[in-house]
Amino acid sequence: QLRMDDFVGHIVESLKISDEAILNSLIARKLNIEFNNQLLNVFAEDRGKIELHVQNENLHIEVEQERICANRLDFGLHTEAIYIDDPFVLDNIDIRLNRRPSRRFMDHRDQLIRKLLYENEHTSVVDEIVVENRFQKIYGKLQNVCNGRMIRQKSGEVEYQPKNTEKSISVKNLSTGLKTFVILKTLLLNGTIEENGMIILDEPEIHLHPAWQLQFAELIVLLSKEFGVNVLLNTHSPYFLRAIQVYSAKYEMADKCKYYMSELVDDKKAGIFDVSDDVDKIFEKLAQPLQVLENERCNID
């Protein structure tokens, strides 16, 4: 009887919790996992603010110490952002699978692995053919670099199987550049990349040969044009940035692109500034190290 009373009491107390409190707790848990319990600028005393603007909807979140407060409960996001920042995530794929993290609260790397494998297990040949037919231009360019697919053996090992062969290679033994294309292709084929969805790419060009950088830039632009995918991209490469500009113009997407540059506001804060009307500012900043090197060379001569 005591246990039943405790159970009923727990239900009664749970029903008293507001939807707002539940939402704020969920947001706090997710953000704390992603940012390792450091949501605020450790060098500033100001409370933190997060603002998200999607079409005509706005979400405002205030962060004070570990307390989260969101301004609304009905923010209409129906697609999931896919964050790709490290192709080496495939090297630890078996370890992360065995950790079995909670599906509700995963960091972006665990989330990516789940999308790569668990979604892939439920992808039929018909599903892949539909994607191939619908996005022939994108798929054809992917095939030029990455003609195989990622498979999971009965032993649990994750491997890459090239086209027209029964043999496979451990994903750990793939070149780092190829891993980047394998990840993108797998997410496209298994339906993880949705129409009007979002992909966040953090310096994707780092491990790519210059020729592959061009192909990757073209793929990103085509995904946005053919699939309606929103792409948030960070790069420190003027070469890769120029490739994005050129292919955006080629596929008539230049007016859809926005360019931003980060700069220090003071010793403790940085600002992100829209320079879409003057992209040369970015190239000037990225070219400064090369100018330093040229000055050194001149001094040697």
Predicted regions and their residues:
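Walker B catalytic acidic pair
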Residues: D202-P204
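Conserved D-loop-proximal element of ABC-family nucleotide-binding domains
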Residues: H209-P210, L214
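Walker B motif beta-strand of ABC-family P-loop ATPases
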Residues: M198-I200
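Intrinsically disordered, low-complexity segments enriched in glycine/proline and serine/threonine
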Residues: M4, I206-L208
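Short N-terminal micro-motifs specific to bacterial/archaeal maturation
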Residues: T165, K172, H207, V231-L232
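C-terminal lobe/lid and adjacent interdomain/linker elements of RecA-like ASCE P-loop ATPase modules
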Residues: Q215-D301
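Phosphate-coordinating catalytic segments in nucleotide- and nucleic-acid-processing enzymes
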Residues: L2-N196, A270-D301
